[in-house]
Every structure is written in C-alpha cells, then in structure tokens.
Amino acid sequence: IKIFGSPYTPTYGEWSFMKSRDKLNRYWEQIPEGMDIVAVHGPCKGMLDLSYNRQNELEFCGDSALRKHILNRVKPKYFLSGHIHNFEDIINTGLRYLPDYDITFSNAAGVTDRKFSLGITFNGNIIEI
C-alpha cells in the first residue's frame, strides 16, 4: 500500500502548517502518481468542505488545486482529510464516493458547535482496505 501524507492546508488565520494557495499548488504537484491513500490536513474543494465564513455564510473552502491533482493525476483509492469541522445542518462528515473516479473521500473531523467546546463529536470513519 502506497500512502502520501501532509499536514499542509491553505492559509486561514494564524495556524501552523499553512501555505498560500500558489505555494500549495507547487507542493501538490510533488504528490507521486499511483498512491493508494492520500491523507492530508485539508480537503479538496467541493469534497466535504462546506464551512461557515466570518459572515456566517456557507462556502466551499477546500483547495481547488489539490482537487485537480487528486482527480486528474494522482487518483488514489482513498482521500482522507479533516480540518473542516462544521457539520451543523451540513453533510460534511463521513464518506463520499465518486464512481467516475473510483475515489472515496473521507472527513472525520466534525464538531457540533463550531467552537470545539464539545470536542470532536464524530466518531470517525472505518475503511476496509
């Protein structure tokens, strides 16, 4: 089994392991093709990545460059991420399978109140390989 892992995610606030989207695109270009599993901190754009912005509006906040590399070049069997914690009134946790690409996306980082006061409240995903 070939696995690629990364802690990086697009810049949002003052957190560790963040890079500008331009720098991240160059970084994602280095993901080797033929990986079975890609496990990264943040999701691809449009894949379990809905979140409330500062204006309390929903937006897709995943990385579009990462999505391009995953769907068109790397093509892993499984793509695992977290980082997007909102799941109040949103389906953001769990698994999403894209049959046209034969890729399963996973987000197991849900919290119920957007403030982490209840902690991680989603029990994760189990994937048989």
Residue ranges and their predicted role:
Residues I1-A65, G110:
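Conserved catalytic scaffold of divalent metal-dependent phosphoesterases
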Residues F4, Y78-L80, T104-S106:
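Hydrophobic/aromatic beta-strand patches that form the interior of the parallel beta-sheet core
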Residues W15, Y52, H83, S117-L118:
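Generic alpha-helix signal with a bias toward terminal, lower-confidence helices
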Residues M35, V40, D63-N86:
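Proline-aspartate-enriched helix->loop->beta-strand connector
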Residues K68-R73, H85-I129:
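Binuclear metal-dependent phosphoesterase catalytic core
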